[in-house]
Amino acid sequence: MVDHDVRVEVAHGDPSSTLVVHGEVDVSSAGVLEAAIAAARDGGCREVVVDLGDVSFIDLAGLRVLHLAAVDGLGVVVRNPSRLARRVIGLAGMTDALPIEGDDEVG
């Protein structure tokens, strides 16, 4: 999936899929991430691992997409968050809702 601001590479698996996000996830591009998550769910995925290592910007619209997927029953795990993504997750108070794989500190 490609947008001028964000690109999401998807590796489908069973029961989880990995989404590698590149670029900026904001109010204008969060729909790309939302569509990738929906496609994974529609494909039978029960968990998504979202790699945010190459995210140069993420705002609350991007976190909202991840949070709503988790609230809706999909397992959501954040992997390799960029420094900015890690900070935004911490500042938004979403460390419990969006666990970071292999990480004990956010902020």
Predicted regions and their residues:
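STAS-like cytosolic regulatory interaction modules
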Residues: 1-107
